[in-house]
């Protein structure tokens, strides 16, 4: 077999392939990765590079003992919104709960009003700025939900903005749009059944027809959608070729996890109030459990998702930021990794795999989240030599170079380069 001709090489690295299961980062010390075009062409021992790869004309990055991982996959975000909820944050700091604030006219309703009033270009620019902050921290794939428009015209508008986001970023990240049913629009709260029927008959088919989203997500929660309502929406989405997902068991045990298992959802996210029956249902159906620890921290709760029980039951897990204005106003990747270890009980290796291969699985993207021949060349060089260091040095951006489809899309200043050997 002829040697691949590399266009980019990262060498003298500790490579984490993230392709050996949920608890093994697949660490290869003294390793190199060769990229040909948009794909990984070879990964192996650095000393074997010249014999295995034609790298004479390649761009070479000397990792100096640094960790090289797959690009992170942020599988749950709400980047498209306007306005702020700082006042609501202050109320919660004074003792009001998230549900109390929402029921008194705050919460999603505040963001919906601001988002509906904002012009497209403002929403796009703000979403792009948030995405850029994620990219600079090693995220190369971002799932982006609609959900703050609530009614059909606004949800369609938001999804079209999400579609423009990839171009606005110049291809520096893959953007995967999701149609999110966040709550019943205020104009239709008196006819919930009518809203669901209309969404199933009109909105979902239009989203599928125009290919505005690959996923459909429903917030199954008190004050949002009941399981029976969510079942109708998600089944209609499945029938139109959209992949179903759910927000489940975040604030109350509402049955969302069992619904996810019943419908074969790609993921059930949040799960702070998940019970043993829900764990068993997710395990049997092989639904990915989406872990979002920034939300638990931001809401001032100590009820984190039962990550260890999920892993021990054989449930695949993902880790994501859940960046949104109400329950996780942060794009901090490092803090997310640290919380996964400190509060969810994951090892640093498990947290890294969940943020790479786990996110790819939740989004059904088999060529993402791993370093292997033929996989997408989405890579990150970190200014440290291990997953443990990433989680230990909290809330710091350790990303030195970010590669998307074989192209360096972000590089830290030279002063940030460190020798990890």
UniProtKB/Swiss-Prot annotation:
Example GO biological process: L-histidine catabolic process to glutamate and formamide
Binding positions for Fe(3+) per the UniProt entry: 76, 78, 247
GO molecular function: imidazolonepropionase activity; iron ion binding; zinc ion binding
EC number(s) recorded for this UniProt protein: 3.5.2.7
Binding site for N-formimidoyl-L-glutamate: 148, 324, 326
Cofactors required: Zn(2+); Fe(3+)
Keyword flag Iron: yes
Compartment(s): Cytoplasm
Reaction catalysis annotation: 4-imidazolone-5-propanoate + H2O = N-formimidoyl-L-glutamate
Top-level division of the source organism's lineage: Bacteria
Keywords: Cytoplasm, Histidine metabolism, Hydrolase, Iron, Metal-binding, Zinc
GO cellular component: cytoplasm
Pfam families from the UniProt entry: Amidohydro_1 (PF01979)
Disulphide-bridged cysteine pairs: none
Pathway membership, UniProt: Amino-acid degradation; L-histidine degradation into L-glutamate; N-formimidoyl-L-glutamate from L-histidine: step 3/3
Chain residues that bind 4-imidazolone-5-propanoate: 85, 148, 182, 250, 327
Keyword Iron applies: yes
InterPro entries: Amidohydro-rel, HutI, Metal-dep_hydrolase_composite, Metal_Hydrolase
Cofactor: binding comment: Binds 1 zinc or iron ion per subunit.
Residue sites binding Zn(2+) per the record: 76, 78, 247
Chief localisation class: cytoplasm
Family: Belongs to the metallo-dependent hydrolases superfamily. HutI family.
Role played: Catalyzes the hydrolytic cleavage of the carbon-nitrogen bond in imidazolone-5-propanoate to yield N-formimidoyl-L-glutamate. It is the third step in the universal histidine degradation pathway.
Official protein name in the record: Imidazolonepropionase
Gene behind this protein: hutI
């Amino acid at each position: 077999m002829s040697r691949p001709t590399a266009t980019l090489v990262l060498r003298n690295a500790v490579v984490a392939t993230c392709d050996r299961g949920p608890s093994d980062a697949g660490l290869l010390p003294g390793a190199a990765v060769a990229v040909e075009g948009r794909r990984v062409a070879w990964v192996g021992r650095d000393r074997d590079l010249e014999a295995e790869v034609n790298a004479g004309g390649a761009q070479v990055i000397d990792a100096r003992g640094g960790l090289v991982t797959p690009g992170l996959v942020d599988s749950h975000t709400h980047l498209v919104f306007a306005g702020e909820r700082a006042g609501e944050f202050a109320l919660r700091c004074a003792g009001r709960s998230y549900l109390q604030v929402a029921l008194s006219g705050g919460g999603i309703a505040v963001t919906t009003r601001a988002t509906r009033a904002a012009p497209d270009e403002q929403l796009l620019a703000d979403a792009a700025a948030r995405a850029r902050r994620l990219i600079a921290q090693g995220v190369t794939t971002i799932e982006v939900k609609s959900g703050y428009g609530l009614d059909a015209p606004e949800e369609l508008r938001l999804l079209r903005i999400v579609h423009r986001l990839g171009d606005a970023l110049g291809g520096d990240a893959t953007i995967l749009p999701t149609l999110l049913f966040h709550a019943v629009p205020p104009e239709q709260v008196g006819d919930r059944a009518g809203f669901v029927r209309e969404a199933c008959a009109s909105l979902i088919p239009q989203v599928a027809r125009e290919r505005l989203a690959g996923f459909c997500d429903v917030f199954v929660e008190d004050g949002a959608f009941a399981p029976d309502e969510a079942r109708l929406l998600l089944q209609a989405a499945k029938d139109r070729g959209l992949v179903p997902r759910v927000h489940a068991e975040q604030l109350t045990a509402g049955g969302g996890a069992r619904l996810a298992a019943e419908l074969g959802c790609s993921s059930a996210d949040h799960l702070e109030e998940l019970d043993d029956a829900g764990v068993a249902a997710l395990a049997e159906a092989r639904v990915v459990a989406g872990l979002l620890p920034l939300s638990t921290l931001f809401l001032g709760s100590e009820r984190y998702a039962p990550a260890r029980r999920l892993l021990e039951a054989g449930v695949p897990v993902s880790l994501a930021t859940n960046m949104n204005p109400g329950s996780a106003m942060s794009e901090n990747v490092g803090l997310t990794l640290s919380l996964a270890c400190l509060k969810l009980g994951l090892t640093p290796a498990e947290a890294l795999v969940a943020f790479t291969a786990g996110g790819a699985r939740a989004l059904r993207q088999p060529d993402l989240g791993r370093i292997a021949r033929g996989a997408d060349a989405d890579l990150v060089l970190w200014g440290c030599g291990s997953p443990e260091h990433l989680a230990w040095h909290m809330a710091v951006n350790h990303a030195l170079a970010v590669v998307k489809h074989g192209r360096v899309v972000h590089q830290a200043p030279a002063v940030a380069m460190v020798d990890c050997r």
